[in-house]
Amino acid sequence: MKKAVILFNLGGPDSLSAVRPFLFNLFYDKRIINLPNPFRFLLAKFISKRRESTAQEIYEHIGGKSPILENTKAQADALELKLNENGNHVYKIFICMRYWHPFADEVVKSVKQFDPDEIILLPLYPQYSTTTTLSSIENWQKNAKLECNTKTIHHYYDNEDFIEAHVNLTSKYYKLASKIGKPRVLFSAHSLPLSIIKKGDPYASQIEKTVKLIVKKLNIEDLDWGICYQSKVGPVKWLEPSTESELSRAKDDNIPVVLSPISFVSEHSETLVELDIEYKAIIKDGYYFRVPTLSTDLLFIKCLADLCLDHSQSTDL
């Protein structure tokens, strides 16, 4: 059988000139700003124009573009290799970005040419949210219209290999930080407006469950740890505490910090600029230890492969 795996991710501008249209696509998503048109269209135009220069400055720090597509391609290559190890089926990975190329309508054409017997939808969002997972799946379904058996993986926040991969990386950096003093481990996730959480979005509760499983598996006596949220935009109330405020508190306590980006699985502007430049500057020199994202970690790729294999043999979850 031929099986297509669609890897969903956010996407990112591939040049400085792409920043404004990328931002427009982001804020025009009804799962991000829930307003009827023409108000959502006008607001997306306004926000993308207003934030363009600030966002461009961010991307200038990392070569004038987002590395997310390149990093996702590396994950796709590793996953395709893993899935095709036994040779029972032919798996082909397709990358589908939400707010910049390759868009769903472009990917659908490639999938049709492949002509799979089965399609597996795999968001690169470990924790489910209507703003990420659901938005990507809805957008795919709107564009795909394929008569093909389709399975959807909604989340994997508690997957054993996913947790173990985080434990291994966090433990490594904890040991490094321990040479200075007793570290505080901060698990940083992308924040969301509280209004979305109050409508029943499970994202925050799944973040908490992920972190508690990691902490339990770390098995470090009297571990000092906390959950914090980054990347807030706008004046409304978001999930707290903020990563910035927690880093400031750690600075006041004069302790080393191990920071793990718990909701991101690849490096992009929120990790390479926000965490590695802006937030790092808060902490005393030599006291900041940033755990890398899972990227192509062998256990993480195994996690994704097993999810695909399990869903191929089961009903849609």
Swiss-Prot record:
HAMAP family in the cross-refs: Ferrochelatase
Protein name: Ferrochelatase
Keyword Iron: yes
SUPFAM superfamilies hit by this protein: Chelatase
GO molecular function: ferrochelatase activity; metal ion binding
Family: Belongs to the ferrochelatase family.
Superkingdom of source: Bacteria
Cell compartments where the protein resides: Cytoplasm
Cellular component, GO annotation: cytoplasm
UniProt-listed Gene3D superfamilies: 3.40.50.1400
Species for this entry: Wolbachia pipientis subsp. Culex pipiens (strain wPip)
Underlying gene: hemH
